[in-house]
From Swiss-Prot:
Chain coiled-coil ranges: none
GO biological process, one term: regulation of sporulation
DNA-binding annotation, residue ranges on this chain: 281-314
Role according to the record: Involved in cell division and chromosome segregation.
InterPro entries documented for this protein: Homing_endonucl, Sporu_reg_WhiA_N_dom, Sporulation_regulator_WhiA, Sporulation_regulator_WhiA_C, WhiA_LAGLIDADG_dom
Gene Ontology molecular function terms on file: DNA binding
The keyword Cell division appears for this protein: yes
One Pfam family, short name: HTH_WhiA
Family membership: Belongs to the WhiA family.
Keyword field: Cell cycle, Cell division, DNA-binding
Protein name per Swiss-Prot or TrEMBL: Probable cell division protein WhiA
Length: 318
């Protein structure tokens, strides 16, 4: 199972205690996996469709507890290449469907006409627990999280721009920074920062998923730090090797053309050590001198040797 599926299974096991929270969560589920069918003579039915059995059980229980009815259920297997199971929760009775849609503030009657509310009615998210329940329902119905090993991305898919904007505002009321974009015929509310995704998981109550994500974040950060250190040390080592090769080349040129006795005693001493110990660092070379010399002092002498080699080459060309 994916990280996203595991998170949904965890969230679907959380059952709200307060009626306000139950209504809020059901409202979000209707917005994301619910469909309202309107027929002639003012008949209405309500259907939920999901591929997650845990989500289907949650919808069934919410409707049963809030409205005292047993909704119809059906399991359908996909055709052709897609053989996954779909779970349908069906409320065919117009009176009950209207009661549910009215309770969650999606359906209103104005002057004898039915009016659909596409946004989130503030009356159903008037407290913190209800907001969290709504967010949980929105994720269970239309949310997903990418594999945190690869990228940090959480999104909520909704079919309506007004609902997308309201959902983004609800998320951002917890000091987060979600954004809304259009994608094909839907709208996507998304977050891309690991820290903010952790916050959303905490808000929804997905504590196991949160801990897993935090562990992955810590591991990735440690791995990145190690890689940076290794890259830095590799770069420094390459720089040291290149400098050593350049210095040895200069010393050998002096040795082959005029001899090392051409150099002042202090430079000759360093030159001989560098040839005999090509792998030593400047600090280690300095410790072998009598008296010992610091890293900057050794570097200064070797640069002097390179300058002498360069002048000898220029003189030879002339």
């Amino acid at each position: 199972m994916s990280f996203s599926s595991d998170t949904k299974d965890e969230l679907a096991r959380i059952y709200p205690e307060e009626e306000e929270s139950k209504i809020a969560e059901l409202a979000a589920l209707i917005r994301t996996i619910g469909s309202i069918s309107m027929y002639g003579n003012g008949k209405i039915s309500l259907t939920f469709t999901t591929e997650n059995a845990s989500v289907a059980r949650l919808v069934f229980k919410l409707i049963k507890d809030l409205f005292g009815i047993i909704p119809e259920t059906m399991v359908r297997r996909g055709r052709y290449l897609k053989k996954t199971l779909s779970y349908l929760i069906f409320v065919p009775d117009t009176k009950i469907a209207e009661e549910i849609l009215g309770k969650v503030k999606i359906l209103n009657y104005e002057k004898g006409h039915i009016k659909l509310n596409y946004g989130i009615d503030q009356k159903i998210v008037k407290n913190s627990k209800a907001k969290k329940a709504y967010l949980r329902g929105a994720f269970l119905g239309g949310g997903s999280i990418s594999d945190p090993e690869k990228a940090y991305h959480m999104e909520f898919i909704t079919h309506n721009l007004e609902h997308g904007k309201d959902l983004s505002k609800l998320i951002n009321s917890f000091d987060l920074n979600s954004k809304v974009i259009a994608r094909k015929n839907n709208y996507v509310v998304y977050l891309k920062e690991g820290e903010q995704i952790v916050d959303v998981l905490n808000i929804m109550g997905a504590h196991s998923a949160l801990l897993n994500l935090e562990n992955i974040r810590v591991y990735k950060e440690m791995r990145n730090n190690v890689n940076r250190i290794v890259n830095c040390e590799t770069a420094n080592l390459t720089k040291t090797i290149n400098a050593s090769l350049r210095q040895i080349e200069s010393i050998n040129y002096i040795k082959e053309t005029v001899g090392l006795d051409y150099l002042p005693p202090n430079l000759k001493e360093v030159a001989e050590l560098r040839i005999n110990y090509p792998d030593l660092s400047l600090k280690e070379l300095g410790q072998m001198l009598v008296p010992p010399v610091g890293k900057s002092g050794v570097n200064h002498r070797l640069r002097k040797i390179e300058e002498i080699s360069k002048k000898l080459k220029e003189r030879r060309v002339q």
